[in-house]
């Protein structure tokens, strides 16, 4: 019996916050792995997605959005994004076609050039008419003629098949790093924490989501094949804790119920979720939390 030839290729997706990196990762692997919210800077660490197509295994790295960082946490997130380039065969810069090229995007382009990285450009959100797209295409064609450009829509899937064909064509003969059915190498504890953090981002207003983190403290498999999960929501102020709890605990119950449903849908088994809120001032300056967040 002839042994199947195996190929692998790794892809790093970088770009500004809310340009569609996480949506594209989820679109390609066919699962909602990387959390997506309307708020910027939702992704804090490198999220690894895996898809195996015939003989080729594609490893995708979704990265934190690159912006001008201010605090310690923001600086760590941006460093994390740039560090992902070293692990990739292909670097893809995703650009929001609904916005003009701004100074941050130009800074990203300049840094890639200084690193001798020739990116593949992904002009995202083409499912919506844009007055900026022609100017962006013209600028990239004139200044980055060595780079390929794919106009895509991560949310609708338009042209993502062509992008996958290109990625697959760049794969090299090498043993797969993961099992054929794997979609990520992230621990389930981490994924569960990200699911809860997504619900906090969606359910809380203004700046509060940026002032918290979530840790899965306990993961206990029960005899009935369900799992008991204890999570701690860490905030920097007592007033934030009050908001998350809500009147008579109503808000945290609502957020917990939504998180539990998402976990059950993703993991495929019943979940008993218990959320607790802890106040720790300046937790953003504690490197122990960064290690847990993988940044």
UniProtKB/Swiss-Prot annotation:
A Pfam family assignment: KH_2
CDD domains: Era, KH-II_Era
Keyword set includes DNA repair: no
G1, as annotated region: 15-22
Coiled coil spans: none
Role of this protein: An essential GTPase that binds both GDP and GTP, with rapid nucleotide exchange. Plays a role in 16S rRNA processing and 30S ribosomal subunit biogenesis and possibly also in cell cycle regulation and energy metabolism.
Subunit structure: Monomer.
Species lineage: Bacteria, Pseudomonadati, Pseudomonadota, Alphaproteobacteria, Rickettsiales
NCBIfam families xref list: era, PRK00089.1, small_GTP
Residue segments, region G5: 152-154
GO MF annotations, alphabetized: GTP binding; GTPase activity; ribosomal small subunit binding; small ribosomal subunit rRNA binding
Residues annotated as binding GTP: 15-22, 62-66, 124-127
Mode of membrane association: Peripheral membrane protein
Region of interest called G4, as start-end residue ranges on this chain: 124-127
Sorted UniProt keywords: Cell inner membrane, Cell membrane, Cytoplasm, GTP-binding, Membrane, Nucleotide-binding, Ribosome biogenesis, RNA-binding, rRNA-binding
Domain Era-type G, chain residue ranges per copy: 7-176
Primary gene name: era
GO terms for cellular component: cytosol; plasma membrane
Record's subcellular location: Cytoplasm; Cell inner membrane
Protein name: GTPase Era
